[in-house]
UniProtKB/Swiss-Prot annotation:
UniProt keywords, alphabetically: RNA-binding, Transcription, Transcription antitermination, Transcription regulation
Gene Ontology terms describing biological process: DNA-templated transcription termination; transcription antitermination
One of the Pfam families matching this protein, by short name: NusB
Protein name: Transcription antitermination protein NusB
Family matches, as Gene3D superfamilies: NusB-like
Family stated for the protein in its record: Belongs to the NusB family.
Amino acid sequence: MSKERTRCREKVLEFLFQKDLGQEIEVDFSDFSPQGQVFAYKLYDGALYYKDLADEIISKFSKNWKLERIGTIEKNILRMAIAEMFTFSDIPQGVTVNEAVELAKKYVSPEAGRFINGILRNIVRNWDEVKKLKEGFVDVTSEN
């Protein structure tokens, strides 16, 4: 499942990137096993659900980097990793960080991998503070 999860993350990143660019997309994870589809849909939905909170967390824990200066791919990798940590408590945070770093190295550059690693490691080190931010999170996209 881990190789499939890596492919799922890549596909989720692709959809998040396209959505961020304002493109019309049809989200489809049917190429994956049933377990992979569940993982991919939950990760995609989580990344969208937690987008504003993730952006707040990224802004807080990215030293000397304003959110608008971070590239679109890198931002989406960070959002996805944060959503994964919130959504899948059974996946060790270190695995999530490593997967995010590999995505950044593959789709951006080795430097982007180091950048992503630094921010996510800072987030993990301050996880209690992150959880408090999550507790105060109000999803403004919900209709309630």
